[in-house]
């Protein structure tokens, strides 16, 4: 009897010897299992941690799983980095309030010891205060003493003028004298003396104008003080403290930076100056046109303006060419054959009035004027709901006559499940974020910031999360993708969504409900191109597996822990709403598979609890009118275990299994030909058997698989985690799991991660054969869904990239290789990639 696809026993003992040394902390840890070869062993009572079908290196989350982020304030850490040049020199560690206070106290002490150290503060006393304001704040009579000061200034100016006149007369006598002691070769001519005198007079006039302006500003200030009176004095800063001193030390936040106002912060430093403050001062009329206390000279911000402008030009000269090069490189690497438009469409709002939206709905997710993209949405307002879920954006009519190709019936005719295989793709990383699919959302954060999943990303983005993620929803998958899916010969789409498309709870930072609108539009695009839909709840309340693609990496809180029962009920409430919505007539022909939960980790959860919930959820959605097949995941149990499980289940249920070789250290190290043989021998028979109601469980689909033969894709094993292929995955073991690990040369991810334009013909031939072998094996069951349709840079995980670059069949229903055919020769293809 063939071994299970996820078994490592037949490949020698090195896997089991190293099992205890492997951490289970990786993003798609759902895949590698240490399965039992005995298909007849159906006992479920053994301790889960002792089962031979345990996933490779798995340890229960509550024992060994690292959360992957620190409990420290991640937002503060990033602000430290972003504002590093603004702070005092020193370590970048986050400082406490006490540290900030000590720093300010030391700065204050320096002001007392050396008030003239800085030219900008020569008018301050040893206490760091403005000499003028210090005296005023000590209780002077402002009106009387102001007149006295102006009188003293006038007397002083008169004395200085007499001294200057005396000096000029002395110089003139000297140059008029014929005395040899007063003669020299460098004596100036009369014209030169005249020019010098004119220049001197011009300088004097400028100084007098400055003094006049200063006096005018002082009179204006005194006048304002007299009008405001005691109220103004009550609001005045205490002696020795300016307004700037009261500003909080931290002036930056993630949201502030997201708004594009970081240049303002660089000017503001720790709370003073900058465009925002200057505009406010002008508006209040309390700014005399300068930031200099003396009232003279060019204002600080004007002196800096030209310097800043010059620096900005230099930066742009450097940054723009680099950005263009990086952008071109990124586009070529992710999908060289195509590029997605990023300009939002809002033309269907033309001619409409915002007043057509009720006041209570304006500014909410029901207001199309707040949407990033309104293309193909019905923007006529409605607050109607079904199952508590909005229908806003939908048209009232639909057409189910389309078909994707001649091999598939149109939507208004039943699909022959059981006699014709499903050929579909997933839309992973779109409405449920996954780092390795969209690394650009995570690349801007440092490794210590702890931004590792949608929870931490949404929390970090704060008020900008909605706009950032909606732009991703609108641009990552568009109508053109559904047209391409049809043209590739595919006929089904498995669409991921998470519970926050429906509702959020407690302190959830997730963006609520916006993805719901894009889910509904995606289904309408599927309808247009004749594609049937498999709904896949990828994240449910509490997390069903503790992995990043469930929304939050860490502890499993569904059916487990303190809030396990609470989240159980919440997940049923989500299905109650969603099932009522998709039980509408408009979805009867198109939503043909209804998923319950993606990849519940039954190696950690109570199997009985999961099965009880599955039965209850299935009965609930069917009671609400769902006639589609209901899909449940195998939970990573050995498929042979399912032969005796849920025998008395409700009707129309599918078992969903996800198969990958690269997360199993016994399989990732096979050479190219051996991997194809594994698929066509072991997997082929395994799927065929479990799909039978007499020898297995019954109708079985493969909801996820990939042609990737390495785990080299960036962030695939978690943000910041290495690879098994190069021996950098484990924190304690550097063993490489690749075909040439023992003989050399060392395996490298360079070729697997290279731009697809650099793939050799032999490598493309292998990748296509490897994919077609899996298609053949999974079609012995109900069919398959490839993971995934599109990625930003992981070419071997993108059906779209492979299809457009010649290492997927031109039509999914017409492969060039099937199991039973001779495995082709892959030429001189090296085994180390």
From Swiss-Prot:
Residues 183-196 have a biased composition (Low complexity). Belongs to the glycosyl hydrolase 5 (cellulase A) family. The active site is at 599 (proton donor), 704 (nucleophile). Residues 337-346 have a biased composition (Polar residues). PANTHER family: GLUCAN 1,3-BETA-GLUCOSIDASE 2 (PTHR31297:SF34), GLUCAN ENDO-1,6-BETA-GLUCOSIDASE B (PTHR31297). Keywords: Carbohydrate metabolism, Cell membrane, Cell wall biogenesis/degradation, Glycoprotein, Glycosidase, Hydrolase, Membrane, Polysaccharide degradation, Signal-anchor, Transmembrane, Transmembrane helix. Its main location: membrane. GO terms for cellular component: cell surface; extracellular region; plasma membrane. Gene3D superfamilies: Glycosidases (3.20.20.80). Residues 1-33, 46-75, 97-172, 200-217 have a biased composition (Basic and acidic residues). It comes from the Eukaryota. The chain crosses the membrane at residues 306-326. Its EC number is 3.2.1.58. This is Probable glucan 1,3-beta-glucosidase D. GO terms for biological process: cell wall organization; glucan catabolic process. Residues 1-305 are cytoplasmic. Glycans are attached at residues 332, 378, 383, 395, 548, 560, 569, 638, 671, 691. It is found in: Cell membrane. The keyword Cell wall biogenesis/degradation applies.
């Amino acid at each position: 009897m063939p071994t299970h696809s996820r078994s490592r026993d037949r490949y020698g003992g090195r896997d089991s010897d190293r099992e205890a040394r492997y951490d289970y902390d990786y993003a798609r840890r759902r895949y590698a299992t240490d399965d039992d070869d005995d298909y007849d062993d159906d006992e479920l009572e053994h301790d889960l941690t002792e089962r031979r079908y345990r996933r490779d290196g798995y340890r229960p989350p509550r024992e060994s799983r690292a959360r992957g982020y620190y409990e420290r304030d991640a937002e503060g850490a990033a602000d430290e980095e972003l504002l590093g040049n603004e702070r005092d020199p020193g370590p970048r560690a986050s400082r406490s309030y006490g540290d900030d206070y000590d720093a300010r106290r030391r700065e204050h002490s320096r002001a007392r010891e050396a008030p003239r150290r800085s030219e900008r503060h020569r008018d301050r006393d040893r206490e760091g205060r403005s000499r003028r304001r210090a005296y005023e704040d000590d209780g002077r009579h402002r009106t009387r003493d102001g007149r006295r000061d102006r009188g003293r200034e006038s007397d002083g100016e008169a004395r200085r003028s007499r001294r200057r006149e005396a000096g000029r007369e002395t110089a003139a006598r000297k140059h008029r004298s014929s005395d040899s002691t007063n003669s020299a070769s460098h004596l100036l001519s009369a014209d030169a003396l005249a020019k010098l005198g004119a220049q001197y007079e011009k300088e004097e006039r400028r100084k007098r104008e400055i003094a006049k302006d200063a006096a005018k500003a002082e009179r204006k200030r005194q006048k304002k003080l007299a009008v405001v009176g005691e109220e103004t004095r009550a609001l005045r800063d205490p002696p020795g403290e300016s307004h700037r001193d009261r500003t909080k030390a931290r002036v930056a936040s993630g949201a502030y930076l997201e708004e594009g106002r970081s240049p303002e912060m660089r000017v503001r430093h720790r709370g003073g100056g900058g465009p925002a403050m200057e505009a406010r001062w002008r508006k209040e009329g309390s700014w005399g046109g300068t930031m200099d206390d003396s009232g003279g000279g060019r204002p600080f911000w004007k002196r800096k303006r030209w310097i800043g402008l010059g620096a900005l030009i230099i930066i742009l000269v450097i940054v723009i060419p680099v950005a263009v090069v990086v952008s071109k490189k990124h586009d070529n690497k992710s999908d060289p054959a195509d590029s997605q438009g990023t300009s939002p469409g809002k033309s269907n709002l033309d001619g409409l009035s915002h007043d057509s939206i009720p006041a209570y709905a304006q500014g909410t997710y029901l207001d199309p004027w707040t949407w990033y993209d309104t293309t193909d949405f019905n923007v006529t307002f409605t607050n109607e709901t079904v199952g508590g879920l909005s229908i806003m954006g939908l048209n009232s009519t639909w057409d189910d006559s389309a078909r994707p190709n001649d091999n598939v019936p149109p939507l208004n005719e039943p699909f022959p499940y059981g006699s014709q295989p499903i050929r579909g793709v997933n839309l992973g990383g779109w409405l449920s974020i996954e780092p390795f699919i969209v690394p650009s959302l995570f690349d801007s954060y440092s490794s210590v910031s702890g931004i590792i999943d949608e929870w931490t990303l949404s929390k970090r983005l704060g008020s900008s999360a909605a706009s950032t993620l909606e732009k991703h929803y609108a641009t990552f998958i568009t109508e053109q993708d559904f047209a391409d899916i049809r043209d590739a010969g595919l006929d089904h789409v498995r669409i991921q969504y998470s519970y926050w498309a429906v509702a959020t709870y407690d302190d959830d930072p997730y963006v609520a409900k916006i993805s719901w609108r894009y889910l509904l539009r995606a289904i309408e695009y599927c309808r247009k191109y004749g594609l049937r839909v498999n709904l896949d709840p990828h994240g449910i309340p509490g997390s069903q597996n503790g992995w990043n693609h469930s929304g939050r990496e860490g502890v499993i809180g569904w059916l487990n822990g303190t809030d396990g029962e609470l989240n159980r009920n919440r997940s049923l409430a989500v299905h109650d709403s969603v099932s009522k919505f998709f039980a509408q007539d408009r979805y009867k022909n198109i939503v043909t598979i209804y998923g319950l939960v993606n990849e519940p980790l039954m190696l950690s959860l109570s199997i009985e609890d999961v099965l009880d919930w599955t039965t209850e959820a299935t009965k609930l959605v069917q009671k609400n009118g769902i006639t589609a097949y209901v899909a449940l995941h195998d939970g990573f149990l050995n498929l042979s275990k399912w032969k005796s499980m849920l025998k008395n289940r409700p009707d129309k249920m599918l078992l969903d299994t996800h198969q990958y070789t690269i997360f199993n250290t016994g399989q990732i190290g096979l050479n190219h030909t051996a991997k194809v043989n594994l698929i066509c021998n072991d997997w082929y028979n395994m799927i065929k058997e479990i799909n039978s109601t007499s020898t297995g469980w019954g109708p079985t689909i493969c909801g996820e698989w990939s042609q990737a033969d390495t785990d080299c894709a960036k962030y695939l094993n978690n943000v910041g985690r290495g690879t098994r292929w190069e021996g950098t995955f484990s924190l304690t073991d550097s063993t490489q799991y690749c075909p040439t690990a023992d003989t050399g040369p060392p395996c490298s991810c360079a070729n697997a991660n290279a731009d697809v334009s650099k793939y050799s013909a032999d490598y493309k031939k292998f990748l296509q054969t490897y994919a077609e072998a899996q298609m053949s094996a999974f079609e012995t069951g109900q069919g398959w869904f490839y993971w995934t349709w599109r990625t930003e840079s992981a070419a071997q995980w993108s059906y779209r990239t492979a299809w457009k670059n010649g290492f997927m069949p031109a039509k999914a229903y017409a492969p060039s290789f099937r199991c039973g055919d001779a495995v082709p020769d892959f030429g001189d293809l090296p085994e180390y990639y």
